[in-house]
Amino acid sequence: MEGSRWRFRSFLDYGSLDILQPNVCYNGGYTETLKIASLAQSHNIPIANGGGWPLHNLHTMAGLMNGWRVEFHLGMQATGELLFKDPPKPDGNIVRVSKKPGLGLEPNVDALKDTLMLPRNA
């Protein structure tokens, strides 16, 4: 999996890929992923997120002219279902984007308490 916009650009320049698979968690966030998507669109190449974390990539894919598929890994989906209240879930091959504000993800504060890390000298 690639994370650098410049590597994706090289792939596009050489016509090496038919589909790009950026991921907001590995590409430097939403803005960087949008830049990669724009590069891909200029070459008429679709985007299908790769590497999982569907809950973080769903809105990006839905909002892109060349956005295509969202990759769902069962383990990462289970993590999202633990950390967020009522996250979007696939229904067959369809996932509906939440109409809630932002990413549509409400943190499960009770579950997050179990992940809290305190400084050693606290």
Where would I find each of the regions flagged by the language model?
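C-terminal extensions of enzymes
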Residues: L83-A122
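Shared catalytic-loop signature of beta/alpha-barrel
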Residues: M1-I94
